[in-house]
Amino acid sequence: MKLEMICTGEEVLAGQIVDTNAAWFASTMMEHGVEIQRRVTVGDRLEDLIAVFQERSLHADVILVNGGLGPTSDDMSALAMAKAKGEPLVENAEWRERLEDWFTRNNREMPLSNLKQAMLPASAVMVDNPVGTACGFRVKLNRAWLFFTPGVPFELKHMVTEQFVPFIRDEFNLDSKVALKKLLTIGQGESALADKLEPLELPEGITIGYRSSMPHIEIKIFARGEKAIAVLPRVAGHIKMVLGTAVVAEDKATLAEEIHYKLLNSGLTLSVAESCTGGMITSQLVDFSGSSSYLQHGLVTYSNESKVRVLGVNPSTLDDHGAVSIATVEEMAKGARQILDSDYALATSGIAGPDGGTDEKPVGTVAIALATRGGVYSQMIKLPRRSRDLVRSLSAAVAYDMLRRELLAEAVIVDYQSIGRFSK
């Protein structure tokens, strides 16, 4: 099966918005063992839409079209599809009734413009949208099925998961026996990871893919077929052994997610004191429901005064060692833990750049500490030639990994290939 995607919208074409729908769709299809062969972006011009539908339908087996199903004049996907096939738009009575019911239930009067959303190409098969007013549909043109979906991400995800994936499995007799194992890594580049993994002799049906989402690189191990699925745990275990300390989580999207579930299930508590990461560690944990059960407080102590007054850092420590130092970050972590008697506390202080570095402490120097009931672990890492955002996100990831290793009773301080460290 040859799968393609057509993304519509002037704002997408002009780069005014980032097309997260395309990234999500491609990733989701990969998890089902299907690779997108081509993606095309086209603006809201009728003749361009008609042309791309006609052209790509000669080459693909199925095309997911995203966007252009709204009620406004620049929503042209249905009309363009009808013209591409040489048939009229007709009102879908079922969807009109759904629209009227939706507005009634929400105590709103339906604008006449919304009736446009019930107008589908004559040969279209309606595709349900249980969470919005944009009617999905599919049409056969030349060799391809074109599957039309709304641009609203929440609606797209429902339609792809509940309608599109079952459709292509049935229509193209796809093997549903596909399993996926994800390994999340930090501290090594994609090429370095590939150098270690590509020499491996993998069993038939096992393939490896890489996805860079800094500060992480995700390794996806696909198993297609019953025999490959049976050996997937063994293969994944061997890959973890080969990569060593680079692997920080399994089947999680982020290291923050890994930490969230470990703390949630342990009953242990955490406090955070952040300087250069500016609340990033705390914010990433709060993204997950239930974090209030373990996250006692998150403090952004950016100034030296706040480090002294809020966390109890000794002024002489700052005078003697500076804000970005092992001594200071250890006192920050101890102070944050003691405020509410947390089981653990993380602290960061660094120079994220692009200014502020010195010969002794260049941009990218970050001190990180983990305070426990039994003591404090600390390190000062080097992240040269990284952007400000990447310095902050990598620092947060290293802090998380220190806590993760402590929770697993492993060595808290480890070497990462692409992250340097100052000697104490």
From Swiss-Prot:
Pfam families: CinA (PF02464), MoCF_biosynth (PF00994)
Stated name of the protein: CinA-like protein
Family recorded in the similarity comment: Belongs to the CinA family.
NCBIfam families: cinA_nterm, molyb_syn, PncC_domain
Organism: Shewanella baltica (strain OS185)
HAMAP family in the record: CinA_B (MF_00226_B)
